[in-house]
Amino acid sequence: MPQLNPNPWFFTMLTTWLTFLLLIQPKLLSFIMTNPPINKSSKHTKTPSWTWPWT
C-alpha cells in the first residue's frame, strides 16, 4: 500500500508546514488591522429582572 510509505508524504508535509511557518505567517502578521480592538468601558449596565407571569 503506497499510502503507508511515509517517505514522500512526510517530506511534503514537513515542507508545507515550514513554508507556512517561515514565509506565509510573518507576511500575514505584518498587516495592519483595519479595526484595531479597543478596550470597552468598565461601566456595567444592570438589566432589570424579568417578571414572569406564572410566578
UniProtKB/Swiss-Prot annotation:
The UniProt keywords, alphabetically, are: ATP synthesis, CF(0), Hydrogen ion transport, Ion transport, Membrane, Mitochondrion, Transmembrane, Transmembrane helix, Transport
Q: Which domain of life is it from?
A: Eukaryota
Q: How does it sit in the membrane?
A: Single-pass membrane protein
Q: What is its main location?
A: mitochondrion
Q: How does it assemble?
A: Component of the ATP synthase complex composed at least of ATP5F1A/subunit alpha, ATP5F1B/subunit beta, ATP5MC1/subunit c (homooctomer), MT-ATP6/subunit a, MT-ATP8/subunit 8, ATP5ME/subunit e, ATP5MF/subunit f, ATP5MG/subunit g, ATP5MK/subunit k, ATP5MJ/subunit j, ATP5F1C/subunit gamma, ATP5F1D/subunit delta, ATP5F1E/subunit epsilon, ATP5PF/subunit F6, ATP5PB/subunit b, ATP5PD/subunit d, ATP5PO/subunit OSCP.
Role noted for this protein: Subunit 8, of the mitochondrial membrane ATP synthase complex (F(1)F(0) ATP synthase or Complex V) that produces ATP from ADP in the presence of a proton gradient across the membrane which is generated by electron transport complexes of the respiratory chain. ATP synthase complex consist of a soluble F(1) head domain - the catalytic core - and a membrane F(1) domain - the membrane proton channel. These two domains are linked by a central stalk rotating inside the F(1) region and a stationary peripheral stalk.
Name it.
Answer: ATP synthase F(0) complex subunit 8
Q: What taxonomic ancestry is recorded? A: Eukaryota, Metazoa, Chordata, Craniata, Vertebrata
